[in-house]
Amino acid sequence: MTERTFSIIKPDATRRNLTGKINAVIEEAGLRIVAQRRVKLTDAQAKKFYEVHAERPFYGELVAQMTAEPVVVQVLEGDNAVLKYREVMGATNPDNADEGTIRKLFALSIGENSVHGSDSLENAAIEIAQFFKDEDIVG
């Protein structure tokens, strides 16, 4: 079933000019990039996006990291896009990620792991709506 999911190419990757290489991995996996924008997250945007982690000890560091430099927000489309992109990203800890995954190829650490991807269709819809209007998404 064709689905949409949300992706962020994080500051550790944009700082190293890896957007094109990451996009190539995404597209080689059969996902289409149907919307993409480079943005500098505000403190308020990052706090809202990561509010699920507000009580976690790493929350402040996460918000600071995500607002330090530009990110690339994306809408990806394809068969079983949520699950497929999570497989393409690899494990959160790059040491545990499978060969050929984005995190194995590009992540610097568990904290600077290069990409975010939605964990469910419901969250994908919520996350997409935070950054894109319907008319921004061109399938």
Curated annotation (Swiss-Prot):
It catalyses: a 2'-deoxyribonucleoside 5'-diphosphate + ATP = a 2'-deoxyribonucleoside 5'-triphosphate + ADP; a ribonucleoside 5'-diphosphate + ATP = a ribonucleoside 5'-triphosphate + ADP. GO terms for cellular component: cytoplasm. Its main location: cytoplasm. GO terms for molecular function: ATP binding; metal ion binding; nucleoside diphosphate kinase activity. SMART domains: NDK. It is found in: Cytoplasm. Its EC number is 2.7.4.6. SUPFAM superfamilies: Nucleoside diphosphate kinase, NDK. PANTHER family: NUCLEOSIDE DIPHOSPHATE KINASE, NUCLEOSIDE DIPHOSPHATE KINASE DDB_G0292928-RELATED. Major role in the synthesis of nucleoside triphosphates other than ATP. The ATP gamma phosphate is transferred to the NDP beta phosphate via a ping-pong mechanism, using a phosphorylated active-site intermediate. This is Nucleoside diphosphate kinase. It comes from Caulobacter sp. (strain K31). The gene is ndk.
